[in-house]
């Protein structure tokens, strides 16, 4: 662990969503986590106390806005306000998993664009920069009028599969929206791609239709940004096997894994599901099929580069 930032104006704080990841990030940077307490009043209101001076400091807050989403967003907003009033030089919010990202447009009449609302709230509270990972909709970057560094999980996932030495692989996108992501992994692994043509009649319900591309006799690797109820990914895995794939792996950056997800994965044709620790994975969800990778080195390096005013774009590759 480097120690060059121990006595610097770089401060890293963690709220309640993912303290283990925050500790790993701080260790990579070479600092301890900042001292703060996040409590609740008897009526449930959030109470935050910053227990050290941060005047003139460049502060980075680690907080995924995962379940419970609204609790974690309020913690983040209140922390930003506290830092602003305590005269922090910059307030950089590190959101490994950006909640509400799937509400990025009006899909039906009279629907809100909640991801834009969240961006407005964060800016109004006083955030000066955002660092995030694999936004569900990349255009969310345009919802902010402050700098945003959008990191990618594909290199981490690709490197893992490269070490496995799998033969005759094909990278599969479970829907048309994920083709760009699948192509990036395919380029890194020098593999062809295939696409699942999927129809979704209502939220959290999906129906696999057709497979575009050659998967017969190949080792298929499904890649997605988020796996929520796992309906899409398990139906895709079953369709791949039915159409001749020899075995199926799956991976994602954000393992939401809500509702019946774990049961579906356990009973599916997926040989291994590779995820990152952008969201805390409870012990009951750590089944043998699930393998977790850490994004701490990636995020830690991004924080160092932002603090040192160096280019972050090198990390996108």
Swiss-Prot record:
D-ribose 5-phosphate binds at residues 200, 224, 228-232. GO terms for cellular component: cytoplasm; ribose phosphate diphosphokinase complex. The keyword ATP-binding applies. Its cofactor is Mg(2+). The active site is at 198. It is found in: Cytoplasm. One of its GO terms (molecular function) is ATP binding. Mg(2+) 1 binds at residue 136. This is Ribose-phosphate pyrophosphokinase. The lineage of its organism: Bacteria, Bacillati, Bacillota, Bacilli, Bacillales.
């Amino acid at each position: 662990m480097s120690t060059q930032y121990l006595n610097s104006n770089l401060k890293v704080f963690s709220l309640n969503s993912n303290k283990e990841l925050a500790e790993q990030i701080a260790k990579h940077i070479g600092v301890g986590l900042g001292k703060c307490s996040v409590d609740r009043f008897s009526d449930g209101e959030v109470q935050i106390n910053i227990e050290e001076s941060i005047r003139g400091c460049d502060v980075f807050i680690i907080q995924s806005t995962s379940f419970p989403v609204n609790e974690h967003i309020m913690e983040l907003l209140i922390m930003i306000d506290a830092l602003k009033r305590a005269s922090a030089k910059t307030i950089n919010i590190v959101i490994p998993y950006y909640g509400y990202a799937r509400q990025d447009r009006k899909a039906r009449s009279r629907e809100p664009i909640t991801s834009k609302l969240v961006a407005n709230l964060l800016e109004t509270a006083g955030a000066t920069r955002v660092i995030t990972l694999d936004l569900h909709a990349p255009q969310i970057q345009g919802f902010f009028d402050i700098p945003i560094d959008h990191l990618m999980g594909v290199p981490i996932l690709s490197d893992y599969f490269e070490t496995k030495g799998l033969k005759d692989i094909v990278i599969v996108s479970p829907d048309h929206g994920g083709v760009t992501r699948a192509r990036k992994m395919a380029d890194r692994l020098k593999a062809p791609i295939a696409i699942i043509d999927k129809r979704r009649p209502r939220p959290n319900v999906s129906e696999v239709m057709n497979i575009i591309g050659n998967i017969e006799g190949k080792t298929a690797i499904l890649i997605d940004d988020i796996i929520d109820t796992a309906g899409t990914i398990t139906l895709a895995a079953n369709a791949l096997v039915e159409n001749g794939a020899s075995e199926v792996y799956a991976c994602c950056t954000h393992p939401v894994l809500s509702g019946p997800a774990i049961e579906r994965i356990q009973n599916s044709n997926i040989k291994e599901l590779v995820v990152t620790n952008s969201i805390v994975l409870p012990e009951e969800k750590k089944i043998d099929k699930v393998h977790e990778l850490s994004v701490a080195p990636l995020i830690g390096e991004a924080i160092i580069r932002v603090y040192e005013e160096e280019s972050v774009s090198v990390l996108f590759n």
